[in-house]
Structure formats: C-alpha cells, structure tokens
Amino acid sequence: MAPNIRKSHPLLKTINNSLIDLPTPSNISAWWNFGSLLAVCLITQILTGLLLAMHYTADTTLAFSSVAYTCRNVQYGWLLHNLHANGASFFFICIFLHIGRGLYYGSYLYKETWNTGVVLLLTLMATAFVGYVLPWGQMSFWGATVITNLFSAIPYIGQTLVEWAWGGFSVDNPTLTRFFALHFLLPFMIAGITIIHLMFLHESGSNNPLGISSNADKIPFHPYYSIKDILGLTIMLTPLLTLTLFSPNLLGDPENFTPANPLVTPPHIKPEWYFLFAYAILRSIPNKLGGVLALAASVLILLLIPFLHKSKQRAMTFRPLSQTLFWLLVANLLILTWVGSQPVEHPFIIIGQMASLSYFTILLILFPLIGALENKMLNL
C-alpha cells in the first residue's frame, strides 16, 4: 500500500501531527477554543496591519494625516483600520480568557507551556502599546510619554535608558519611527514564540476539565475539534464584525482624534481598556519606583503561579472554595479595570489601593492557603 503523503512528507507530517491526527482529550470544553482563536486573531492582525502599513507614514508631520487618508481615500481603508483596532481588543479578550482557563483548570502545571505563554502576553502588550502610538493623536503621544517615562524610575541608568528609547530628549520623530519598526517586527516574534508554545504543549498533550490524565481516552483533533474551533471562530467573529461595523470607536479614546500636541496635556491620560487593570495598580502606589515595580509584578506574578499550587487536585472543578476565590479575583480585576479609567480623586484612589492589595493577596496568599485547607478537609 502506498504511504499516505500526509503522514510521510517532512512538512505535511508536522502539520498532520499538530492539527489533524493530534490525540486530544475527548472531554475538553469550549474553554479550550481560545488557543485557536488567538491564532486567528494574530493572522488577522498581521494581514490587516500589513495592508495598513502600506499606506502609513512614520513621520510626526504626516502620521495623523496618513491614518485619516487611509480611512477616507483607500479602498476599504476604514474597514482595515477599524478591524485592526478592534481586533486588538478581541485579541486581549481571548488571551485573558485563555489565561483564566489556565488558572482555573491548573494548566499552569505544564510549566514550559505556561512560561512561554507569559512571554507571549508580555510581547503582545508591548506590541499593542507601540501600535497605539502610531496614529500620533493626543492620547498616542501622551500615553507614549507617560509609559516610557516610567523607565526613568530605574535607579542610576533610568534617565539614560529613557532618552535612549526616545532617541532624544522627548517623544518625537525618532520615537515614532522606532515604534513603527517595533510594531512591524513584534507580531512576527509572537508568531515564532507561538510555535514554541505549541511545541511545548504537544510534548505533554492538552489538560482537560477534570484535571486528570486523559491517556485512556483520546480522539483525533480533526474532525472533532477542527469543527468545534470553527464554531468558536464564528461566535467570535460575530461580535468583532458587529463592533467594527456599527460602533468602531466605542473602545477608543475621543482624545485620539486630535493630532498630538506636546504643549497641551489631555485632562485624563489613560491607556486602552486592556491595560487599565495594570494602570490602576501602577497609580495606586504613591511612589514612582514602587508603582513601576507593582506594575511589572501585576503581570510577572503569573510566573509564580505554578509554584503556589498547593492542592493535591489539579483543576478547580471539584474545589468550591478555590472556585469562589477565583471568581473573586475576576471581580477584583473588573474593579481594577474600572478604577483605571477614572480620574485620580477621592473615592477612586482608595478603591484602587484596596483592589490592588486584594489582587496580590488573593494570588500570593489566599490561593495556596485555600489549596492546603481543601487538602486537609478532604483528608488528602
């Protein structure tokens, strides 16, 4: 019998083992859809971004006009622009849900997969940040100024580092040029790290909602999960297209429709919604270096999660106390996101500080404690 080319060809064999004949647990739920959705988001962002880059000019005098020109005069330029801007929001929605799934079901015990995932999150955040600067509106300019300035809090080398990043003594043309270069490069880095992420995942195989070994019951990825992923894709594309076509500027800041002006500071400088939780943590500490450290810790804390797992069970499926704590953490993150969008005044300052404290307390202290308590209650 002639060998199946899908299984013998050097390149097709890899694709086959990753996407077609991949042995997959038979009971993974829709929460396992987000990996493929993130891949689709990345491809969409790279394609729309590439087409937008063809019409963009990375120069302070022309950037704002070139974006307006793309939206007005390029065929479907408005659609590319809005898909790219809102696609970023959906990228973050998917990655937050993907991380939440990993936390809930103990997927972080696959340490290499988890750590590459954290690197992917950081790279995505960097990409989104430099991308937000490109239209060179007011919020682009002041966001870039405020966030890059945080590096000056690093002792001894801080100021030098900031001026090196800016390419001068303030955010100006060199800054915009290098941010465009970085925004073009980073998504391809994300694609590369994604392949490493998948490589590590396929070493161990997927986790499942029960958190137990699924070796006894595996099914091929195609057609079962390929069709399930396509369903997930259509469910995601519906709100993305609805947002893009009906209310494209809903998640943006009106301030960014004003060209950048170094002489006028906007009343409230705030990042896009997906950074607000970290921004709230940054603002809640009345010290520059302390705030920067808390900001870094708010994301890097994910690297500690595997070491804080004290339960004898992997997933939270059968652990009601940990489940309660998990949803408290979700509520806490929503509060942080809301507080980050509010001005720095009386009720919001204290709410932000309490929510920031709760965030670190839940992750660093309460999760391990409750895990150990549940072991004791179950005599494990």
From Swiss-Prot:
GO molecular function: metal ion binding; ubiquinol-cytochrome-c reductase activity
Co-factor note (free text): Binds 2 heme b groups non-covalently.
Key words of the record: Electron transport, Heme, Iron, Membrane, Metal-binding, Mitochondrion, Mitochondrion inner membrane, Respiratory chain, Transmembrane, Transmembrane helix, Transport, Ubiquinone
Membrane topology recorded in Swiss-Prot or TrEMBL: Multi-pass membrane protein
Pfam families on file: Cytochrom_B_C (PF00032), Cytochrome_B (PF00033)
InterPro entries, A to Z: Cyt_b/b6_C, Cyt_b/b6_C_sf, Cyt_b/b6_N, Cytb/b6-like_sf, Cytochrome_b, Cytochrome_b_C_euk/bac, Cytochrome_b_N_euk/bac, Di-haem_cyt_TM
Residues reported in the UniProt entry to bind a ubiquinone: H202
Transmembrane regions listed in the UniProt entry: 34-54, 78-99, 114-134, 179-199, 227-247, 289-309, 321-341, 348-368
Cofactor(s) the record lists: heme b
Positions contributing to heme b b562 binding: H84, H183
Record flagged with keyword Cell cycle: no
Chain residues that bind heme b b566: H98, H197
Protein task: Component of the ubiquinol-cytochrome c reductase complex (complex III or cytochrome b-c1 complex) that is part of the mitochondrial respiratory chain. The b-c1 complex mediates electron transfer from ubiquinol to cytochrome c. Contributes to the generation of a proton gradient across the mitochondrial membrane that is then used for ATP synthesis.
Recorded family membership: Belongs to the cytochrome b family.
Protein's recorded name: Cytochrome b
Organism: Meleagris gallopavo
Originating gene: MT-CYB
